[in-house]
A protein has these predicted regions:
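Small-residue-biased structural context
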Residues: 1-180
Length: 180
């Protein structure tokens, strides 16, 4: 992903154009696409070491994604949709789904730390994929359209998400340990 980091480095010089080009929804959809691609690679992988590597990358990407959604996106979405009962219900469901995803991620990470890339771990990655696909579908088809109409400043929220994501990556995921 050298292109992505090179693009991120130049964003300081072109912040307004970058913000318009990658609002919060665009950033979250890009994350969804990245994780979907990793799951596809995982399904094709035959070597246990490669599967373990991909499972770890999937877990890391999802952990970062969940953190920025929970810390920044969901609270602001909740404020923007405060008069929309369906929107609030979608956010409640998304937060509950995150809880289930975190349990599976923790179980997969425990297995990886114990070097257990077995059938059970493989099944957990498959179930994680199914949960993520369901979660993504609801966000992209139901929640995001509501937020586009809400008046929420998605460019500003996108900038906040980008900054937090960069902080987490710079901290090497250590800042996330206290979130669990």
């Amino acid at each position: 992903m050298p292109t992505r980091s090179a693009h991120t480095q130049t964003s300081a010089h072109s912040k307004p154009a970058r913000s318009r080009a990658r609002d919060a929804i665009a950033l979250l959809k890009a994350d969804h696409k990245t994780v979907s691609g990793l799951f596809k690679e995982y399904e094709k992988a035959e070597d246990a070491a490669r599967k373990a590597e991909l499972a770890e990358e999937i877990c890391n990407e999802l952990t970062i994604h969940a953190a920025i959604e929970e810390d920044i996106f969901y609270p602001q979405a909740r404020d923007a949709l405060s008069d929309d009962n369906d929107g609030i219900s979608l956010l409640d469901e998304a937060e509950v789904e995150h809880g289930s995803l975190k349990v599976l991620i923790a179980e997969i990470e425990d297995a990886l730390e114990s070097a257990r890339m077995d059938g059970k771990t493989d099944a957990k990655v498959t179930v994680l994929k199914e949960y993520v696909e369901h979660h993504v579908k609801e966000e992209e088809k139901q929640l995001f359209p509501k937020l586009r109409k809400s008046g929420l400043d998605l460019s500003e929220v996108g900038e906040q998400l980008r900054e937090r994501k960069e902080e987490i990556k710079a901290e090497g995921m250590s800042g996330l340990q206290q979130l669990s």
